[in-house]
Amino acid sequence: MASLPGPKSRDVQEMIRHLKWSHAEKQIARKAFELALDREFRNVIRRAKDMAGNIEQPTDLWDLEHYLTESRKRIDRTYDYRYSVLTDVFGRLIREGRLSEKELQGLGEDKLESIRSYAKLLGKLEEVGLKPGGS
């Protein structure tokens, strides 16, 4: 059974929320974020077009609508550009294969370490059968 984060974990979380982002890091982060989001949208568009091309009965329409609704909810949960959570967002995107660490090249080591740590945490949660929130 998973335990709640202890005081040390909360200190780390507080530190992450207050990371300082330089102008150059903000530009790198924005570019990587937009790149991953664009890939996500292209995948949704591709699948929606495939589904639309195969519509033969009314239930197929609702399947498409359901897919689009769920895709939007997932994207809205995942893609959050607030700097206070951005390292977690990037960690999740790397863990899910939607972004590579190379695409974050130029971020400070403090941010990269936070991103790696979160990706690693998500991996451990998956190993024990827990599904992290947000996707």
Show where each model-derived region lies.
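Acidic, Ser/Pro/Thr-rich low-complexity regulatory regions
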Residues: A2-S135
